[in-house]
Amino acid sequence: MPNYSYNPTIGRTYVYDNKYYKNLGGLIKNAKRKKHLIEHEKEEKQWDLLDNYMVAEDPFLGPGKNQKLTLFKEVRNVKPDTMKLIVNWSGKEFLRETWTRFVEDSFPIVNDQEVMDVYLVANLKPTRPNRCYKFLAQHALRWDEDYVPHEVIRIMEPSYVGMNNEYRISLAKKGGGCPIMNIHSEYTNSFESFVNRVIWENFYKPIVYIGTDSAEEEEILIEVSLVFKIKEFAPDAPLFTGPAY
């Protein structure tokens, strides 16, 4: 019904209420959209059985080359209902000989290589045979430089270590990546400044605790390593000239 109103300045006007009018194009589009959704739901029902399976999107397996640096291997005893600190970034994790050998092998001078990510990997193995228990792990990425972590803590909301008893943590900060392109030259300038300026400026320094769900004290072989995810670039020009090159 039209809505009549009187305006003395312009005379009688007619105002129509558009509440009951629909755009014809909109009606057709909505009908096609509903039809498409119904067909899409029928198609999706064919894949309902696959909902019982899990597929992990693991950046560790993505593009790039993985270069592993083993920091140390050692045996630790872990008491029940407790977790032991295994990574505290003391001097033994950064032995100059270990790092020099790693950089020489993994970052040759002839390539420009960018560090896309760094993973801390802890591989855990029971030293005694016929033991039936699962490994537990807990970590923190950010902590104050003055904070001194406890060597042993009680088990509080840990996560179970997954496949192959390997616990892996991405250390990349928000945004990811490392701006240094020529790792070899940066390392050879100064070992100490390389670790502090290149590694810890761009990646987190985590603390990691390991435990078990066993009711007895267990002896664990722990291997801790850093895995560098590397993107390689071809050099702009050869570094050597002559018939041998």
From Swiss-Prot:
A GO term from the CC aspect: viral occlusion body
Keywords: Viral occlusion body
Pfam families from the UniProt entry: Polyhedrin
Keyword Transmembrane set for record: no
Highest taxon above the source species: Viruses
GO MF annotation, one: structural molecule activity
Family under the similarity heading: Belongs to the polyhedrin family.
General function of this protein: Major component of the virus occlusion bodies, which are large proteinaceous structures (polyhedra), that protect the virus from the outside environment for extended periods until they are ingested by insect larvae.
Protein name per Swiss-Prot or TrEMBL: Polyhedrin
Gene responsible for this protein: PH
